């Protein structure tokens, strides 16, 4: 069984992405790493992602293709379990993993699930054209979600903006806000097209989400590839103290309840959904 990992980055040093650490992780896990987007245009459209991701998937030679964001790793302790999981579900189009979202090295939230572990050997017609932004994988037009593919407790470790400065975040958020406006005709919850306005909207979202970051761990618990970088976060980087937010936020009982509900109860409820085993549905995919 051969595993390919597809990722993308553009000017990763300028954008302060943990790209060196991420690629080291990918090369340790996969037989092949395909890197896209090195010449991706500054002012992009969301529709630009579809052909890029499709090209990455189609050019991959692995039996399984894992689509990874460059700020996301898989823990080395899960490598063998992941490989065994791929063998177990070899007849399914994808596998869904949990997403551990980090803003600081010491707390995380189980934000969502992602169906980005894709079975190319048996489902070569997978395309990246689904979801709200048109970048999620589909099979025969069916959006791959956590409800229609097998689910694993293995996690994607997502570091989001941990290593970025306020200036880098502001410019990134403004670029994405402009792309959002070009696609949907409004800015939604992204604020506006200037760095200042986009950052303000983003930071309000961060404050809301950080309230649910109630699960704690030590730096040594992280994937080994990223530990040294986490130990050397500078004061002007978001992950140092969230630009002051870390010291000012006061969590309520509701915040803890919501965090535990999303991590445990929602998974418990989801465990009863076995629709992915429906052979008729699987044949349609």
Q: Language model features by range: what are they?
A:
Residues 26-27, 57, 86-87:
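N-terminal cationic-hydrophobic initiation segments that often serve targeting/anchoring roles
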């Amino acid at each position: 069984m051969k595993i390919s990992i597809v990722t993308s980055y553009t000017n990763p040093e300028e954008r302060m992405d943990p790209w060196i650490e991420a690629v080291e992780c990918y090369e340790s896990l996969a037989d092949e790493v395909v890197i896209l987007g090195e010449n991706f245009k500054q002012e992009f459209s969301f529709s630009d992602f579809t052909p890029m991701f499709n090209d990455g998937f189609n050019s991959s030679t692995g039996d399984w293709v894992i689509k990874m964001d460059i700020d996301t790793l898989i823990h080395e302790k899960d490598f063998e379990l992941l490989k065994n999981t791929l063998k177990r579900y070899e007849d399914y189009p994808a596998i869904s993993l949990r997403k551990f979202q980090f803003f600081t090295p010491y707390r995380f939230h189980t934000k969502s699930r992602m169906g980005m572990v894709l079975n190319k050997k048996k489902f070569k017609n997978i395309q990246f054209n689904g979801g709200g932004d048109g970048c999620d994988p589909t099979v025969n037009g069916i959006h791959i979600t956590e409800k229609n593919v097998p689910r694993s407790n293995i996690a994607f470790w997502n570091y989001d903006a941990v290593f970025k400065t306020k200036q880098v975040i502001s410019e990134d958020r403004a670029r994405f806000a402009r792309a959002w406006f070009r696609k949907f005709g409004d800015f939604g919850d992204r604020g506006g097209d200037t760095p200042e306005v986009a950052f303000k909207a983003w930071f309000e979202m961060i404050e809301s989400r950080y309230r649910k970051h109630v699960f704690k761990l030590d730096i040594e618990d992280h994937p080994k590839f990223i530990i040294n970088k986490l130990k050397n976060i500078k004061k002007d980087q978001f992950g140092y103290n969230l630009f002051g937010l870390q010291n000012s936020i006061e969590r309520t009982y509701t915040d803890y309840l919501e965090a535990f509900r999303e991590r445990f109860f929602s998974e418990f409820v989801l465990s009863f959904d076995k629709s992915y085993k429906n052979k008729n549905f699987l044949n349609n995919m």
